[in-house]
Amino acid sequence: MSRVAKAPVTLPNGVSVTLNDRQVEVKGKNGNMSLRLHELVELKQEDDAIIFSPTVDSKEAMMHTGTMRSLLNNLVIGVNEGFEKRLQLIGVGYRAQAAGNKVTLNVGYSHPVEYTLPEGVSAETPTQTEIVLKSNDKQQLGQAAADIRGFRPPEPYKGKGIRYSDEHVIRKEAKKK
């Protein structure tokens, strides 16, 4: 069986999980989230731990078991603590502003770029060159961060662009005569 699937998901205090006809609902202090359980995976709850197991003994079932365990673990963390991603804008005149559900970026184009955040994702700008995205949904948060980064990905020669705060950009040397 998948090594990931062997580890049970532990439920912290204040988080409850209910299973209704292959639909798993997770409730916590940051809201509710749900997940559709794959037909090759079954789960059982023991005290404050959830154990996953495949319904049939096949490689595909084991793969789905590990995936479902990771997805449910992300839901539990999301409704309990939430997720955060930080983006940095590096370049002369590059700046960002967050207002409501929109992020306005000035990243070297002739016009400011406006990005509408998906529902459930919030943004704040502690400085003009930093964006902090927060959400309960890890997948939605990562997609929003990737969309914003896609407006001006970091380039390898000067390093200008929008990058994740923990991203390392490999620099290239300019062509020599």
Swiss-Prot record:
User: Where is region (Disordered) located?
Assistant: 143-162
InterPro entries (UniProt xref)? Ribosomal_uL6-like (IPR000702), Ribosomal_uL6-like_a/b-dom_sf (IPR036789), Ribosomal_uL6_a/b-dom (IPR020040), Ribosomal_uL6_bac-type (IPR019906), Ribosomal_uL6_CS (IPR002358)
For this protein, the record's Pfam families field holds:
Ribosomal_L6
GO cellular component terms, alphabetically, are: cytosolic large ribosomal subunit
Q: GO MF annotations for this entry?
A: rRNA binding; structural constituent of ribosome
Alphabetical UniProt keywords: Ribonucleoprotein, Ribosomal protein, RNA-binding, rRNA-binding
Q: Which GO terms describe its biological process?
A: cytoplasmic translation
Locate the compositionally biased regions of type Basic and acidic residues: 149-162
Q: At the top level of its lineage, which domain of life is listed? A: Bacteria
Q: How does it assemble?
A: Part of the 50S ribosomal subunit.
Stated family: Belongs to the universal ribosomal protein uL6 family.
Q: What does this protein do?
A: This protein binds to the 23S rRNA, and is important in its secondary structure. It is located near the subunit interface in the base of the L7/L12 stalk, and near the tRNA binding site of the peptidyltransferase center.
The name this protein carries in UniProt is Large ribosomal subunit protein uL6
Write down the species: Psychrobacter cryohalolentis (strain ATCC BAA-1226 / DSM 17306 / VKM B-2378 / K5)
